[in-house]
């Protein structure tokens, strides 16, 4: 434990996702040893992000405008919507340069343990986006964990009542992974998603 404001800084940094006590302490001491100008700039950027960044009115992605750059891009295919849990998932998929459709960010996943149900997510907005018939395929790209699977199952059942093709991203063995370390579910999915090579 440190005295006063130093401990407060460590505690606040430790509240960030993925930052444990040791990382929080390292970051705090880095800040203490950094030039005042750089620390001030960091504080300004943090405040500016909170002021200027919002969520796209259409898809829920982060944006500095009412609609995000992806939803505004006329080169994107409006017949394809990829449903993800969080905006950071959009970034991950965009890095692949494989998907040229639009996105829909749910803002989380169904998690009864955490008290998150379908009404707490942007599912109603997704259904509204599908109403005009432009969308031909919805690709469900939720995380391959219990919450992501529950969300994918809920969405697939809900969307089968609409005139839209519903698909789920394949999951299976990671490139460079060893079979002996794969769990049964991952191996099972790898077999289900296998494709012909010759």
Curated annotation (Swiss-Prot):
Superkingdom in the source lineage: Bacteria
Keywords from the UniProt entry: DNA damage, DNA recombination, DNA repair, Metal-binding, Zinc, Zinc-finger
Ranges in a coiled coil: none
Gene3D superfamilies in alphabetical order: 3.30.60.80, 3.40.1360.10, 6.10.250.240, RecR Domain 1 (1.10.8.420)
GO biological process: DNA recombination; DNA repair
Family note: Belongs to the RecR family.
Stated name of the protein: Recombination protein RecR
Native organism: Leifsonia xyli subsp. xyli (strain CTCB07)
């Amino acid at each position: 434990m440190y005295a006063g404001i130093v401990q407060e800084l460590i505690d606040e940094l430790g509240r960030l996702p993925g930052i444990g006590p040791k990382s929080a302490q390292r970051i705090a001491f880095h800040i203490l040893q950094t030039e005042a100008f750089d620390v001030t700039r960091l504080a300004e950027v943090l405040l500016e992000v909170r002021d200027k960044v919002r969520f796209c009115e259409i898809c829920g992605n982060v944006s500095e405008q009412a609609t995000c750059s992806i939803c505004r891009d006329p080169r994107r295919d409006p017949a394809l919507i990829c449903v993800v849990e969080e905006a950071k998932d959009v970034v991950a998929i965009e890095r692949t340069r494989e998907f040229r459709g639009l996105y829909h960010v749910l803002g989380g996943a169904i998690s009864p343990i955490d008290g998150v149900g379908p009404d707490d997510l942007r599912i109603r907005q997704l259904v509204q986006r599908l109403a005009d018939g432009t969308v031909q395929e919805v690709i469900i790209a939720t995380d391959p964990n219990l919450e992501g699977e529950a969300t994918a199952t809920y969405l697939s059942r809900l969307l089968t009542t609409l005139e839209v093709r519903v698909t789920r991203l394949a999951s299976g063995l990671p490139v460079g992974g060893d079979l002996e370390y794969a769990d049964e579910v991952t191996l099972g999915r790898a077999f289900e998603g296998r494709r012909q090579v010759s």
